[in-house]
Amino acid sequence: MADWLIGLIMGAVEGLTEFLPVSSTGHMILTGHLIGFDDERAKVFEVVIQLGSILAVVVIFWKRLWSLVGIGKVTDGPSLNLLHIIIGMIPAGVLGVLFHSTIKEGLFGPGPVVISLVAGGILMIVAEKFSKPSTARTLDEITYKQAFTIGMFQCLALWPGFSRSGSTISGGLLARVSHTAAAEYTFILAVPMMVAASGLDLIKSWDVLSSADITLFVTGFVTAFVVAMLAIVSFLKLLSRVKLTPFAYYRFILAAVFYFFIM
């Protein structure tokens, strides 16, 4: 298969699934297996195109991101600030640094991914069932305690297949944050976390990069960026109506597909 076509397919899958609660890792592994793109080069490629998805968040939330560093206040009164982000980053950041190699070596196989797809789906259903009325209906109403709770749930996303947005939005609901506010906080929180993780992976895999792969990488990056832009905007509109439960059932179906076609 031509490099540009691989880049187009994988970039579209990455952009569509990175910020939806369905596990981008699971979809990337499955898609790579189906099109025969699952070698060492594929692992580096996935890191690069993930940066395209991150750029989409930066573009959509650029005013918010600027306000976090004190440039251009978004709203009067109390608002989301840099400390909210730092607090949310700490739990997963510490675990990620301490267990980066263990996670990469032990949890990226088909078996662990199937388990986390199911477990993540169950968590989402439980969060919907037992969540109480929101005390933080907007991003600016999130407290430091709620930010830390969401950050704790983000630790689950270190297990491939759990889904960052699935685990953090679920944590937000259980902490009495609305669906939309939890999702927006999740996306903003993902920027420093994903940049750090992707940067570390790129440094470790730098010797695998080759100028011969430029078509593959550029096509994948651009496609992931464009599709992620559309996916994020659509998801935020959809989430207030359909909640997390349909995504949970989809995860169960994906786990079954994984079990029969990959394992």
UniProtKB/Swiss-Prot annotation:
Membrane-spanning segments: 15-37, 42-62, 79-99, 107-127, 142-162, 183-203, 216-236, 242-262
An annotated GO cellular component: plasma membrane
GO-annotated molecular function: undecaprenyl-diphosphatase activity
Compartments, record wording: Cell membrane
Membrane topology, as annotated: Multi-pass membrane protein
KW Hydrolase (keyword) present: yes
Superkingdom to which the source organism belongs: Bacteria
Keywords: Antibiotic resistance, Cell membrane, Cell shape, Cell wall biogenesis/degradation, Hydrolase, Membrane, Peptidoglycan synthesis, Transmembrane, Transmembrane helix
Catalytic reaction equation(s): di-trans,octa-cis-undecaprenyl diphosphate + H2O = di-trans,octa-cis-undecaprenyl phosphate + phosphate + H(+)
Leading EC class: hydrolase
EC code: 3.6.1.27
GO biological-process terms attached to the record: cell wall organization; peptidoglycan biosynthetic process; peptidoglycan metabolic process; regulation of cell shape; response to antibiotic
Any one Pfam family match given in the protein's UniProt record, by short name: BacA
Similarity field: Belongs to the UppP family.
Miscellaneous: Bacitracin is thought to be involved in the inhibition of peptidoglycan synthesis by sequestering undecaprenyl diphosphate, thereby reducing the pool of lipid carrier available.
Role noted for this protein: Catalyzes the dephosphorylation of undecaprenyl diphosphate (UPP). Confers resistance to bacitracin.
Protein name stated in the entry: Undecaprenyl-diphosphatase 2
Organism annotation: Bacillus cereus (strain ATCC 14579 / DSM 31 / CCUG 7414 / JCM 2152 / NBRC 15305 / NCIMB 9373 / NCTC 2599 / NRRL B-3711)
Lineage: Bacteria, Bacillati, Bacillota, Bacilli, Bacillales
Gene responsible for this protein: uppP2
